[in-house]
């Protein structure tokens, strides 16, 4: 299970970051380890990384990521399968 603390620690260690383009993502995405996923709504599709951080705090970002990765159902609702979720759990738990 992923916790907000795990995500915060990931940001602090560099394991988690917000990227504009990474691993096939076009636009803002969340990178965890070597993979990435979209986590913003379509209204923010055209933000740059700098604009993102002007609009959202780290705590807001952690909450958004947590709400996607908190369980299999939430992950699947956001287009992530169980294998991807397991990968993110293993990276954040390391």
State each model region's role:
Residues 3-6, 48, 57, 61, ...:
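Intrinsically disordered, low-complexity coil/linker segments enriched for acidic/polar
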């Amino acid at each position: 299970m992923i916790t907000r603390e795990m995500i915060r620690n990931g940001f602090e260690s560099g394991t988690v970051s917000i990227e504009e383009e990474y691993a096939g993502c076009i636009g803002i995405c969340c990178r965890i380890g070597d993979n990435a996923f979209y986590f913003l709504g379509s209204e923010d599709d055209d933000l740059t990384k700098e604009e993102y951080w002007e609009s959202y705090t780290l705590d807001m970002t952690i909450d958004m990521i947590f709400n996607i990765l908190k369980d299999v159902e939430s992950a699947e609702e956001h287009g992530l399968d169980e294998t991807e979720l397991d990968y993110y759990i293993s990276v954040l738990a390391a």
